[in-house]
A protein has these predicted regions:
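Short alpha-helical segment of the dimerization/phosphotransfer core of two-component systems
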Residues: 4-9
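Conserved micro-motifs of the catalytic ATP-binding
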Residues: 24-29, 68-71
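A conserved beta-strand-to-alpha-helix junction within the catalytic ATP-binding
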Residues: 30-48
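Conserved catalytic submotifs in the C-terminal HATPase_c
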Residues: 30-35, 52, 57-67, 104
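Short beta-strand/loop element within the Bergerat-fold HATPase_c
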Residues: 94-106
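Short conserved segment of the HATPase_c
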Residues: 119-133
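Conserved glycine-rich
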Residues: 160-161
């Protein structure tokens, strides 16, 4: 119990630090070409003990294929770790977590699928909102601060991709995100929505990205 609470607190602190970096006004991304399968395998190995303790089967991982993406490896490692952590939390003993990677033209689509209770249709639109506790939508005791999936969305968007969730309640859940396969044109401008739906801007140079992030405090 002590170990579980220590891990929960450590994850909460790390999530708050990640948000603090994003909200500081400027966030630097060091993007390069790398093999997404190496990242996914590394993330799975880092969670090996929890996977074994939960008697969960891992399917789809391969090092035989080389699929290159253009992004910051550290940020994508964090995204994949958060999504795998979420999958482990909601996969029952004897269940399965499945990784897949698919090339789609100028993008690569990465998915992490898990068997289990899934998410209700009513909850699906809200799972990426900050502080949303999807645990409640699954009839489980609330765990975590509801920050991990929101951080995933921000980091994937910063990397030039998109993220979505699909689910069949009572059967499975799948998180899917995309990443570019080539660097953007120097000086390319993009506009991404913040949580209120209003756009904020960031400018991307060839290797470094700077973001001006607007944070709106929410009061109960």
């Amino acid at each position: 119990l002590v170990s579980e609470e220590t891990g929960r607190l450590a994850r909460l602190i790390q999530n708050m630090l990640d948000l603090s970096k994003l909200e500081s006004g400027e966030y630097q991304v060091n993007a390069r070409m790398f093999n997404i399968w190496e990242t996914l395998t590394g993330v799975a190995l880092s969670a090996e003990q929890r996977i074994n303790d939960g008697m969960i089967d891992i399917d789809g991982l391969t090092m035989d294929e080389k699929v290159l993406v253009y992004a910051d490896p550290d940020l994508i490692h964090q995204v994949a770790y958060n999504l795998l952590d979420n999958a482990i939390k909601f996969t029952p003993a004897g269940g399965t977590i499945r990784f897949s990677v698919e090339k789609l033209g100028p993008e690569v689509e990465i998915s992490i699928w898990n068997s289990g209770q899934g998410i209700s249709p009513e909850a699906l639109p809200y799972v990426f909102q900050r502080f949303y506790k999807e645990d409640r939508s699954r009839g489980l005791h609330a765990r975590g601060a509801g920050l991990g999936l929101n951080i995933c969305k921000v980091l994937v968007n910063l990397s030039g991709g998109q993220i979505r969730v699909e689910s069949q309640q009572g059967e499975w859940c799948k998180f899917v995100f995309t990443l570019p396969t080539q660097p953007p044109n120097p000086g390319e401008m993009k506009r991404l929505p913040d949580e209120s739906g209003r756009p904020f801007c960031y400018s991307m140079a060839y290797k470094v990205l700077h973001i001006h992030f607007r944070y709106r405090q929410k009061w109960d």
